[in-house]
């Protein structure tokens, strides 16, 4: 059997860590697109998230999971886009220089 890192317990723990940090973004629908697709579609509007992308959730979860002694050493990423912006904001929110 395959062992996945994500399970219900880890998802709930991440949700607790993100409470008050990440925006609760809306889920929207569009009747026109539903008709065209022949089914009901839902759109999670992560463009309303901090830094304008879903990447903030993962970066924030990772930064706030770090032990204090690890966080004190700082964080680094190889990105020039949404992930870099998300990590920088999450680190700032945690007080990591």
Stretches with model-predicted labels:
Residues 1-97:
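PLP-dependent amino-acid enzyme catalytic core
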């Amino acid at each position: 059997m395959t062992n996945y890192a994500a399970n219900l317990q880890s998802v709930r723990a991440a949700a607790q860590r993100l409470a008050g940090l990440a925006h609760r973004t809306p889920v929207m629908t569009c009747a026109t697109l539903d008709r065209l697709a022949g089914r009901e579609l839902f759109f999670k509007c992560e463009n309303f998230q901090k830094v304008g992308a879903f990447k903030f959730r993962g970066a924030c979860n990772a930064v706030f999971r770090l032990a204090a002694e690890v966080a004190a050493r700082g964080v680094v990423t190889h990105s020039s886009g949404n992930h870099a912006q998300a990590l920088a904001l999450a680190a700032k929110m945690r007080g990591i220089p």
